[in-house]
């Protein structure tokens, strides 16, 4: 699953101040929720200045600031995130077996992530675990992950692998339809559709025996595009209307030279052409060549 990552020149990346400026424009247009993701957002130098600035917008146009992280730096940031106004985070965790976790993450330290989760809970953050379901890799851990999450009072969301970006290993070999996973879980647990709605693509179910909740993100078996109200902004200022399309506008230069009006015009163009649905197909070529780390999960 190795990805050949290439770092960008600093001048091509939005400064933290520019990110705040862009956020203010988006909030003025009606955006009520901002999610910081990656890559790994906590790896950005000075990221807490951005978090603090956005946290000050909560209650002044912004309803919620949330974060998706791989958890490797979470232990040192959890308290500061809560102090800045973050109340919910997602942690990507595809395995709780150290050797397997290291393989999936290409050398990651599982204990470091688990300490981060503990620190987040101690700081008062609500934590949801995101687990990509991978056939022949971690499918034997799904039930135990659900039980662990229930014991830790964490929600769990399972995600189908997506044909996105160029990778060295064929994703088709590891595609695991979540309707299959759901049927397996229903052999042991009672799953009742939840009334919880987060505005995201996940469909939630209450797990009665565990008094917990599980979500399913199914871009392939059950297309979720009809309810999409999201755009994705890369660190370069490129804005994508859809995770599974290359439809985009470039805001960096407009932000630096033209200001809010120029940015608004580009956003209007993007939203007018927002695709009705993605083009993900298992067995086909990747819908887009960019890595998930460019736009986040």
Model-derived regions, located:
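Active-site catalytic pocket residues across diverse enzymes, especially alpha/beta-hydrolases
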Residues: 4, 58, 255
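Short, small-residue-rich loop/turn micro-motifs
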Residues: 1-4, 93-95, 160, 243
């Amino acid at each position: 699953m190795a990805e050949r990552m290439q770092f960008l020149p600093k001048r091509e990346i939005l400064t933290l101040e520019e990110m705040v400026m862009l956020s203010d424009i988006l909030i003025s247009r009606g955006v009520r929720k901002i999610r910081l993701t990656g890559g790994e957002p906590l790896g950005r130098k000075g990221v807490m200045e951005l978090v603090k600035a956005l946290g000050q917008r909560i209650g002044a146009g912004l309803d919620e600031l949330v974060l998706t992280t791989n958890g490797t730096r979470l232990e040192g940031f959890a308290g500061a995130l809560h102090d800045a106004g973050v109340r919910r985070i997602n942690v990507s965790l595809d395995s709780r077996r150290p050797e397997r976790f290291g393989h999936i993450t290409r050398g990651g330290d599982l204990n470091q992530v688990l300490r981060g989760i503990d620190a987040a809970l101690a700081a008062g953050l609500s934590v949801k675990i995101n687990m990509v379901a991978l056939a022949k890799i971690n499918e034997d851990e799904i039930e135990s992950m659900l039980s662990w999450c229930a014991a830790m009072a964490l929600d769990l969301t399972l995600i189908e692998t997506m044909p996105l970006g160029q990778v060295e290993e064929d994703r088709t070999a590891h595609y695991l339809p979540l309707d299959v996973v759901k049927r397996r879980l229903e052999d042991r647990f009672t799953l009742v559709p939840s009334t919880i709605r987060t505005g995201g693509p996940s469909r939630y179910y209450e797990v009665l025996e565990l008094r917990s909740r599980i979500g399913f993100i199914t871009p392939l078996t059950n297309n979720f595009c009809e309810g999409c109200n999201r755009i994705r902004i890369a660190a370069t200022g490129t804005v994508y209307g859809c995770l599974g399309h290359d439809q985009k506008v470039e805001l960096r230069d407009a932000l630096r030279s033209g200001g809010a009006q120029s940015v608004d015009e580009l956003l209007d163009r993007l939203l007018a052409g927002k695709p009705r649905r993605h083009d993900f197909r298992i067995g086909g070529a990747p819908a887009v060549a960019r890595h998930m780390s460019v736009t986040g999960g």
